């Protein structure tokens, strides 16, 4: 099992509740989690309910054929950063890189971690 982040991975789902998500077909122009992430791997994800504006960003683990994703760790959400009890409706489920996990170079070429103390300073200088 590896942590995999990939571009253009986006599917639909109609799963409700707080449990694992059944992943549907790839949206037009995108690929499935099976193709882009791979069986039994983990990835950062976003789930967005189109009808209610519920959202969740977290770390998920795919099952053996990448058709189900277990919501392992919640990073942020519309439920005060706790697991979301998703209502009925169509959801977009896609691979993402959460801002709190980003590492980038500042104007001087120094590495800055978004969760680190230097992030606020770098942002204040940039503004």
Question: What do these predicted ranges mean?
Answer:
Residues 1-30, 66, 75-127:
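Glycine-rich, low-complexity segments
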Residues 34-59:
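Ser/Thr/Gly-rich low-complexity blocks that favor extended beta-strand/coil architectures
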Residues 49, 63, 106:
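Acidic surface patches and DE-rich sequence motifs
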Residues 54-70:
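Elongated alpha-helical scaffolds
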